[in-house]
């Protein structure tokens, strides 16, 4: 299993890659005129996992990662995030 960030047209997406090769998006960051909006995905309703207006993409990424959203989608405890950001697919 791997957790990694990938560039997208409008920001970055965080993915959990499962052992069977399937990828699940577990978070994302959008560039906006006001900064960066970040969401750590969940299977339920949790508005505290979404926040707007981060001044930097690194702060937005730290916010998403703080929730460990991959744990909810099949990740294992202690899973490390791949360093860097992959280019768009």
What role is predicted for each listed range?
Residues 1-6, 35-89:
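Mixed-charge, Lys/Arg-enriched low-complexity segments
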Residues 15-18, 40:
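Short beta-strand segments that buttress and anchor functional surface loops
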Residues 21-23, 45:
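Detector for glycine-centered tight turns/loop "hinges" at secondary-structure junctions
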Residues 25-27:
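Intrinsically disordered, low-complexity proline/glycine-rich segments
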């Amino acid at each position: 299993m791997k957790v990694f960030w990938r560039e997208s047209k409008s920001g970055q997406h965080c993915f959990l890659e499962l052992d069977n090769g399937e990828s699940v998006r577990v978070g994302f960051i959008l560039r906006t005129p006001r900064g960066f909006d970040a969401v750590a995905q969940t299977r339920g309703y949790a508005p505290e996992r979404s926040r707007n207006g981060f001044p930097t993409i690194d702060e937005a990424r730290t916010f998403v990662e703080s929730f460990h959203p991959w744990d909810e989608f099949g990740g294992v405890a202690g899973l490390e995030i791949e360093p860097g950001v992959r280019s768009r697919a």
